[in-house]
């Protein structure tokens, strides 16, 4: 077996953060005893007869796969260019506020109001508000221009909005920001409490600002936040619709959302397909920056929304997901967030054609399943420089999502795989560190999803997987550094495999194990790029 502790090419890796340095140090220390043992050095594998002189494509057939040297130059990539975040600030939010003309607030019925149809239409949802308000349901409507919530003190009935102590307001009806209106909730409002018992929530169809404040789903009977108990129990929420803009800055949102359509927590969503065709609104806009979101059903959700910014937030102890952009949302920036303690599923997930987006410099840890997930044909995304650790499943997971680049991530001490790729092609993994994960450092595989509850027409898939792995370190992962089952192709170059957990040394599971000697000889001893692919494709190459 090759001694891969020797002759590893020197190269520049991303700077290790303290946790990454500690984990890597521990696994390297664990591997020192193995590295010190004398091992039999392999003989170089000779080129196959019949190759043209000067080519580096000698075939080495093993089972149904071949190991081939590949040109390294096409594998070179410059570090990815990240979006400039300097413009997404509290001052930039302030500059977006237009304070004239002044607007007004009034109490009106909820029925026959476009922004509320999602909550008063099918599935007998109107009954929820009848039960809670004990009357034909009403809401507070902001109309006609700019309104600061603090200025409404004493101007509406206490059954609608009451200031219960200086700067602390309780809303006992839903608040609707109408098209053409602006609602500003600023530091004059120490806390806006949305009454759970009375069915209050926030709907934005105009411009909504929450700055230096606190908004809480509130149990009036218990005099505390409406802490999560069961999925279907109503809790207040915030939704911003197509054509509207929402800017949440330096604020805290607690105990939002439940298991009902568009009532998930903090949501930015185009109108439903039927209403969208009728209303023809542009896609919604918004930023969520430098804020804290706690105990929400979904910490953040979007649907058919473009160019949103989710930056510098803390998502803590949310229920299903921390950050969940969904269906056909594009060019998102998800950066500098800390996401931890998600109780049911993933920290950060983008799902169903969330394309051309940037997920970088986030920390996602101690979530119930994976730290970061790309799902259901989400393509063209960059996942870079994230620290993903101690999650209860994988670190980073890609399901049925091709053409994505993972660069410089530190994926550490997760309970399953470090980086897992399923049914996804043209996945490029550059300069990543996967260390101390309980199963495989990088795991690629295929799975037939036909006989599952998946809607194949809505979420098609191919049972194909292909990866390019360049640079980085795979160290001290419990079941091995790398495994790819049935790859369409796999390219490896400058990958350091360190600190095996088994006394026998580095072991590549699965089909890679059958040709481990050839792979490690080319990759480590000869410092060449290695291509592993099916015999059929190599036969096509020769033809």
From Swiss-Prot:
Q: Which UniProt keywords apply?
A: Alginate biosynthesis, Isomerase, Periplasm, Repeat, Signal
How is it regulated at the activity level?
Inhibited by the presence of acetyl groups on the substrate.
Q: Which SUPFAM superfamilies match?
A: Pectin lyase-like
Enzyme Commission code: 5.1.3.37
Tell me what happens on changing residue 383 to A.
Cannot complement the alginate secretion defect of FRD1200 mutant or the epimerase defect of FRD462 mutant
Spell out the catalytic residues.
326 (proton acceptor)
Q: Where is the signal peptide?
A: 1-35
Give yes or no: UniProt keyword Kinase. Answer: no
What effect does gene inactivation have here?
Deletion mutant has a non-mucoid phenotype and secretes uronic acids instead of polymerized alginate.
Disulfide bond residue pairs? none
GO BP annotations, alphabetical order: alginic acid biosynthetic process
Pfam families linked to this entry: NosD (PF05048)
Its subcellular locations are: Periplasm
Q: Which Gene3D superfamilies match?
A: Single-stranded right-handed beta-helix, Pectin lyase-like (2.160.20.10)
The record's comment about this protein's domains reads:
The C-terminal region contains a right-handed beta-helix (RHbetaH) fold, which is common among proteins that bind and cleave long-chain linear polysaccharides.
- Similarity-based family: Belongs to the D-mannuronate C5-epimerase family.
This one is known as: Mannuronan C5-epimerase
Organism taxonomic ancestry: Bacteria, Pseudomonadati, Pseudomonadota, Gammaproteobacteria, Pseudomonadales
């Amino acid at each position: 077996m090759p001694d891969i502790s020797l002759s590893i090419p020197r190269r520049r890796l991303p700077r290790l953060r303290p946790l990454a340095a500690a984990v890597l140090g521990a696994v390297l220390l664990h591997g020192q005893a193995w590295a010190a043992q004398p091992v039999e050095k392999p003989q170089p594998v000779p080129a196959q007869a019949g190759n043209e002189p000067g080519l580096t494509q000698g075939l080495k057939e093993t089972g149904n796969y071949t190991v081939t040297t590949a040109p390294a130059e096409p594998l070179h990539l410059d570090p990815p260019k990240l979006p400039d975040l300097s413009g997404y600030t509290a001052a930039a939010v302030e500059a977006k506020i237009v304070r004239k003309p002044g607007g007004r607030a009034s109490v009106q019925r909820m029925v026959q109001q476009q922004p509320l149809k999602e909550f008063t239409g099918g599935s007998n949802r109107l009954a929820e508000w009848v039960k809670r308000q004990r009357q034909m349901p009403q809401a507070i409507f902001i109309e006609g221009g700019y309104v600061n919530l603090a200025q409404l003190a004493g101007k509406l009935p206490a059954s609608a909005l009451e200031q219960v102590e200086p700067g602390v307001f309780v809303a006992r009806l839903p608040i609707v920001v109408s098209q053409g209106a602006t609602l500003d909730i600023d530091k004059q409002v120490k806390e806006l409490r949305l009454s759970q018992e009375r069915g209050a929530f926030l709907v934005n169809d105009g411009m909504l600002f929450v700055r230096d404040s606190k908004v809480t789903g509130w149990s009036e009977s218990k005099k505390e936040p409406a802490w999560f108990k069961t999925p279907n129990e109503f809790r207040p929420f915030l939704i911003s619709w197509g054509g509207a803009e929402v800017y949440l800055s330096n604020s805290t949102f607690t105990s939002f959302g439940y298991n009902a359509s568009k009532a998930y927590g903090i949501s930015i969503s185009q109108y439903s397909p039927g209403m969208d065709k009728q209303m023809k609104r542009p896609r919604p806009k918004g930023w969520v920056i430098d804020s804290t979101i706690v105990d929400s059903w979904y910490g953040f959700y979007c649907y058919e929304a473009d160019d949103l910014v989710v930056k510098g937030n803390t998502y803590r102890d949310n229920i299903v997901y921390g950050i969940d952009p969904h269906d056909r949302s594009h060019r998102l920036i998800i950066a500098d967030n800390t996401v931890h303690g998600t109780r049911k599923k993933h920290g950060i997930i983008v799902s169903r054609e969330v394309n051309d987006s940037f997920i970088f410099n986030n920390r996602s840890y101690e979530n119930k399943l994976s730290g970061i997930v790309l799902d259901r044909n989400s393509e063209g995304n960059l996942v870079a420089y994230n620290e993903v650790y101690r999650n209860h499943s994988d670190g980073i997971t890609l399901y049925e999502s091709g053409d994505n680049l993972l660069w410089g991530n530190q994926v550490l001490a997760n309970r399953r795989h470090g980086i897992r790729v399923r049914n996804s092609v043209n996945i490029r993994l550059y300069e990543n560190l996967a260390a101390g994960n309980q199963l495989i450092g990088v795991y690629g595989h295929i799975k037939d999803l036909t006989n599952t509850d998946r809607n194949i027409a809505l979420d098609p898939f191919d049972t194909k997987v292909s990866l390019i792995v360049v640079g980085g370190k795979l160290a001290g992962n419990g079941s091995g550094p790398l495994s790819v089952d049935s790859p369409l192709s796999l390219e490896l170059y400058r990958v350091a495999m360190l600190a095996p957990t088994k006394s026998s040394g580095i072991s590549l599971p699965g089909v890679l194990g059958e040709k481990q000697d050839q792979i490690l000889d080319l990759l480590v001893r000869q410092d060449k790029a290695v291509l592993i692919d099916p015999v059929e494709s190599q036969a096509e190459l020769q033809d």
